[in-house]
């Protein structure tokens, strides 16, 4: 996917057009239209473990369950391949959360905050903990990463036991897109950005990204970076690993370094693995126009490592 940002060429025009906030040309084939909502009850029912296993047995409570959080402007589609892997392996469950404001309509997205995005992760975790699941894991891709890191700064996991580990895939703490920093300066002048998608990606991501949500994204990653610089204390019993591609047009690889230095254990460090790939969220291959055997191998290896850690 490629982004196109609508910016005035001459900054002197900013004042003159400050009242402009263009509305994108949305049609009914786009997720932005609200015609293809991922938030309908049937969709949520089959993707959330807390819903489709309403009354877990003791065996199910002892089976690992991983809450999978997708990235900015994406949907649960981003983790479908992990879900299919788990369904085949039958050793763990995947609970695919739809971030608040996502998978609905452009209007819903535009009015959402990063705290609203995060709320679905928190809610599913609390429900699983209350149902007695003893081996809960979290995984987040891209923006799902800082959303999960922010939960580590709260009392959530002390109040609701069960968290055993966290896997972050291409987490964004520093953006590779330097134009993103202009969002705070230009504000309403920016309006929105447009994302170019393959046929296989259409209907799974928002085409248009309102400047209001870009500002929320910047607020989230800026706050997360500051929290990491101060240090975030994590109990030794919670495992954590970051997988980060070395070439990434969305999340700068230095994000992995900041997370490594910022997560504080008493007697260990988090694990970090730099992945030889140019794909952002290399674990999501479906919908891409070009996939190599190396891409497939990296995805399989990562899923197997996650499974092994959860089931050992």
Predicted segments with their positions:
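Catalytic nucleophile-loop/oxyanion-hole region of alpha/beta-hydrolase
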Residues: 104-137
């Amino acid at each position: 996917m490629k982004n196109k940002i609508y910016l005035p060429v001459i900054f002197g025009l900013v004042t003159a057009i400050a009242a402009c906030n263009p509305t994108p040309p949305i049609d009914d084939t786009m997720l932005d239209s609200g015609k293809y909502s991922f938030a309908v009850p049937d969709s949520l029912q089959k993707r959330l473990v807390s819903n489709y296993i309403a009354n877990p047995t003791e065996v199910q409570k002892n089976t690992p369950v991983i809450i999978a959080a997708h990235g900015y402007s994406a949907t649960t589609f981003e983790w479908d391949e992990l879900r299919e892997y788990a369904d085949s392996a039958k050793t763990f469950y995947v609970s695919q959360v739809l971030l608040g404001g996502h998978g609905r309509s452009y209007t819903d997205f535009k009015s959402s905050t990063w705290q609203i995005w995060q709320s679905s992760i928190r809610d599913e975790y609390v429900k699983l903990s209350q149902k007695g699941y003893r081996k809960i894991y979290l995984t987040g891709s891209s923006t799902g990463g800082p959303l999960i890191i922010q939960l580590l700064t709260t009392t959530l996991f002390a109040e609701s036991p069960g968290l055993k580990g966290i896997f972050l895939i291409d987490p964004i703490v520093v953006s590779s897109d330097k134009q993103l920093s202009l969002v705070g300066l230009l504000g309403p002048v920016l309006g929105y950005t447009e994302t170019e998608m393959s046929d296989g990606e259409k209907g799974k991501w928002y085409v248009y990204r309102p400047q209001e949500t870009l500002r929320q994204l910047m607020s989230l990653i800026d706050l997360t970076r500051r929290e990491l610089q101060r240090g975030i204390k994590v109990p030794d019993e919670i495992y954590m690993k970051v997988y980060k591609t070395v070439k990434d047009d969305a999340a700068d690889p230095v994000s992995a370094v900041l997370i490594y230095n910022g997560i504080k254990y008493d007697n260990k460090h988090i694990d970090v693995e730099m992945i030889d790939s140019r794909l952002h969220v290399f674990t999501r291959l479906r919908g891409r126009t070009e996939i190599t055997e190396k891409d497939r191998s990296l995805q399989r290896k990562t899923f197997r490592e996650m499974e092994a850690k959860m089931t050992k």
